[in-house]
Amino acid sequence: MPVLLLVLLALLAPGGVVAQGLPAFAPINPVAAGRTPLSYEPYRPYRPGTWALTAALSYASAIETNNIPTATYLLDSELLRVRFGVSRDLSPRTFVLADAELLGAYSGFLDGFLDWYHGLLGINIPERDRRPHDQFGYFVDLHNEAPLRGRPDDLFLGDTRLGVGVRVHPAVQSVAVVTLPTSTGPEGYGRGVVTAGLLNTAHLAVSSRLAGEGSLGLGFAPRHGTLAESQHELLASGSVGARFRLFGRQSLYGNLFYHTPYYHDTAMPSLDRYDLALDFGVLLGSDLGHEWRIGMTEDLKPSGPAVDLIFQFGGKF
C-alpha cells in the first residue's frame, strides 16, 4: 500500500526537474541472488548526450542455520560483490543500461567485530553462538533432492544484466531487464539460466530537502540446478524509501526492500519465507555531479533468506 500511494502521488505531482534519488539495491545472499532478476532500480533523470557510470562495492556477513531431521541448511560466509554499471539515454523517454559484477565468498574476518556490534545494540544472534568464528560453511540438504555444496572462491565473474527503460511519466519509469548466465563461480552462486524482470519505480519530490521513491517488480526465473524442485519461478518485489538533504549535496537515505519467497516446501524458514531488508546510509555529492555512497544493510527478518549485515560503498559519475 505505501508503494501504490507513492506511485499515485508521483503521477499527480506537477512535472519538473527530478532530484537525485536513492542508491540501487539487490540481494547478495547466494541462495536469493541466484534465483531472481529483481532489485531496486532508482529513478534515472534524463541526461542527454552522456554515459552514466556507476560502481558499487558490497561486503556482507551471512549466518543462517536451519536443521531438522529431514533437511539441513547452513550459510556461514562473508560475501563480496563489486558491480560496474553503464547507462545512456536514447531519448527523453527511453534509455538502456548494462552491468556486470565480480563476486567472492570467504571464511572471513568479521565475526569477532559483529559479536561486539550486536552486543552493543543488544541484539542476540544465536546462530553465531553455535558456529566457530571465521569458518566457511555453505550447504543445503533437502529431502528427496541432491545436496548443494557451496565452496569459497576468492574472485569470480557474476551474471550480466541488460535493460531497456521507459519514462512513462516525468517521475515514473519502467525497466525491462534480463540476466545472462555468465557466472564463472562454483555451484550455488549464479542463476545458471536467463531470467527476466520488469522493475517499476516512482519518484516523489516532497520538498527541496525530502524525496521519496517506491518500486514494484515482477520477475520470472526458470527452475534450474540442484534445488530446482523447490524453486519458485514467479517472483515479486517492492520497496519504499526516502532521501533527506542535510546541507549542500550531502544527504541521508533509507530504503526498505521486500522480496517474495524464492523457495517453497523445504521446511527451512530461511528458504521458504520472504526477504526483508533495510538499506540506509549517507550520500556525499560533489559540484561536478558525482555522488558517493557509504551505507549498511540490516536483515529485518532474521528467519528469512537475507544476511546479517552488509557494508555498502559506491559512486555515480
Q: Which functions belong to the PLM regions below?
A:
Residues P23-I28, S58-R81, L148:
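Surface-exposed strand-loop-strand hairpins of Gram-negative outer-membrane beta-barrel proteins
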Residues E101-E233:
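Outer-membrane pore/translocation modules
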Residues W116-L148, L227-F317:
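Outer membrane beta-barrel transmembrane domains
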Residues D76-V82, L155-T160, G190-A196, S230-A236, ...:
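Residues that define the transmembrane beta-barrel architecture of outer-membrane proteins
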Residues P42, L57, V82-R88, A98, ...:
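Residues on the lipid-exposed face of transmembrane beta-strands in outer-membrane beta-barrel proteins
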Residues A55-S61, A98-L102, S174-L180, G214-F220, ...:
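Transmembrane beta-barrel strands of outer-membrane/channel proteins
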Residues R93-A98, P170-S174, S208-G214, G248-G254, ...:
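Repeated loop/turn-to-beta-strand initiation elements of outer-membrane beta-barrel proteins
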Residues G15-A56:
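Outer-membrane beta-barrel biogenesis signature
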